[in-house]
Regions:
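GST-like fold's C-terminal all-alpha helical module
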Residues: 4-100
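A general structural motif at alpha-helix termini
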Residues: 5, 106-109
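Short aromatic-enriched loop/helix-cap "lid" or pocket-rim segments at secondary-structure transitions
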Residues: 13-18, 107, 117-118
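Acidic/histidine-enriched, glycine/proline-rich intrinsically disordered or flexible terminal extensions
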Residues: 109-129
Length: 129
């Protein structure tokens, strides 16, 4: 469990975060940065896909490693990426998305943009840039 949690903390989270920022939020599009972080995310997705070929979850049973990794993978489209060609990662992603706690956790009210006159994307952009 710790190995896969550290994989998320040291790889998936930081790289996915950078891919999201440069692809979606940065005021200036920097092709080198977008390409670099998208390629690294793709590599990390492939590692996860290979692991999930023989395991239902990252560490065998559902664990904090899955809980910490899933939200980052859920942002793949925000980074201009797809997981469709990775069948094991896609299966894992969809399986976790159906969990009751995930469904409840994703039900975020629109209070984030209340009173700002800005969209959620603009509020997030102001926060991350």
């Amino acid at each position: 469990v710790m190995q896969w949690l550290m994989f998320q903390m040291g790889g998936v989270g930081p790289m996915q975060g950078q891919a999201n920022v440069f692809h979606r939020y940065a005021p200036e599009k920097i092709p080198y940065a977008i390409d670099r972080y998208q390629k690294e995310c793709t590599r990390l997705y492939e590692v996860l896909n290979n692991r999930l070929a023989d395991n239902e979850y990252l560490a065998g049973d559902y664990s904090i490693a899955d809980m910490a990794t899933w939200p980052w993978i859920s942002g793949h489209k925000w980074s201009g990426l797809s997981i469709e060609c990775l069948p094991h990662l896609t299966r894992w992603f969809e399986q976790i998305a159906k969990r009751k706690a995930v469904i409840i956790g994703k039900d975020i009210p629109d209070e984030m943009e209340a009173g700002t006159g800005k969209s959620k994307v603009d509020v997030i952009r102001d926060f991350v840039i």
